[in-house]
Amino acid sequence: RAVGSTGSGRHLAAVLLGADVVKNEITAHAVAASHLFPGAKTIIEIGGQDSKIIILRNNIVHDFAMNTVCAAGTGSFLDQQSARLNIPIQEFGDYAVKSGHPVRIAGRCGVFAESDMIHKQQMGFPVEDIIMGLCEALVRNYLNNVGKGKKIEEPVVFQGGVAANRGLAKAFEKILGLKINVPAHYEVMGAIGAAILAREQIELSHSPTRFRGDNFVLEGNFTSNSHECSGCPNLCEVVCIKRDNEVLAYWGDRCKKW
């Protein structure tokens, strides 16, 4: 048994669970893709809040880029549009692949994309063509921003929660002219990669896992507080995590004083 943590909340999860390995999302996604698709060269990852591209060579991260500024093309933007159209997000991709003639949607900005979609609705275009047009616009936006200057080669793996949208996978294939592979567990590839790394760490070190057990989290009373450290001009905001009034960890201090 072994536990790994990754993602934006990996440090907090590591403290609560007792993780054996703490890895960034780039490494975790790369490990998972290489494990399930040996020889993979390009990873397209689009989640709820951000998107990224990872270039692999010989199963090693060669280059990567992330977009954490603009929401256009992320899962949250697609959720907003599915709600506006009164279509369950689970069916969004199904509508898109039924399109016969996708309409051109401006996808460089989420605000403009939504405005353009409304305009196309008012003109009477079928909703399937509008949704597929949105998918193609988001793919162009992704390639012009996140994928700019990157050499995208096969095998290409599409992962992250947005990979559930068959319309986006189809749009990537159409625009890139490449086959897009979607893993069975596309939404948790980062977790799979962290788990693989944790298992390897335990096997190499021959040491017991640091996993605290389910009850540690389920039965404990957790609290957190923060304060500004005045020990130096950095004025770091230090966060303290406690379980039943026992300090588990501090972080946020640059000098590791706490």
Question: Whereabouts are the PLM-identified features?
Answer:
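Glycine-rich phosphate-binding/hydrolytic loop that grips phosphoryl groups
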Residues: 31, 78-79, 184-213
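Adenine-nucleotide phosphate-binding core of ATP-dependent small-molecule kinases
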Residues: 115-144
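Glycine-rich phosphate-binding loops at beta-strand->alpha-helix junctions
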Residues: 6-9, 137, 148-175, 186-190
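Conserved phosphate-binding/catalytic loops in two-lobed NTP-binding clefts
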Residues: 20-27, 173-192
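Short glycine-aspartate micro-motif
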Residues: 2-4, 41-44
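Acidic, glycine/GT-rich loop-and beta-edge segments that sit at the periphery of enzyme/chaperone cores
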Residues: 52, 200-258
